[in-house]
Amino acid sequence: MRSTLAALSTTLVLACLGAPAVWAQSATHMMVMPDQMKWADVPSLPPGAKISVLEGPLSEAVPFTARLKFPANYQIPAHWHPVIEHVTVISGTFNIGTGDKLDASKTIALPAGSVAIMQPKTPHFVWTNDETIIQVHGVGPSGVNYVNPADDPRKK
């Protein structure tokens, strides 16, 4: 109890003194501000997507949280993931459908604030009209497996 109160007191003091916006007190406590996320290309997705891994890594059997940023007019062909993924739309509109081939007429438009829970090995596809940011979390190892191997950008 004392260590919890001491950590809370330290947190409040640092917050009042203008401590950096992103920091971790321990392995179980972390805060991340959007402007301090580090974005990188995503080799398993078509060019243009960016990822910021907040918790992970995605390749291990541990909890993961990541943000993905997609440009306007972006498409991801039909693919599936080996684990359940919880998707929250942070901004923009995330158009998602299930099936073996991308068909924009068979999607549901999820606006900011929406949630999708993708079951393992369920083929699905996505596209955007405008820049869209989603947050994905689950327990790894995660990955992207394309229904049509020719769609996999890692093989091009």
Give the residues covered by each predicted segment.
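Conserved short histidine dyad/triad with adjacent acidic residue
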Residues: 61-81, 110, 119-120
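A short, N-terminal "cap"/entry segment at the start of jelly-roll beta-barrel domains
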Residues: 22-64, 149-156
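Double-stranded beta-helix
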Residues: 28-31, 105, 125-156
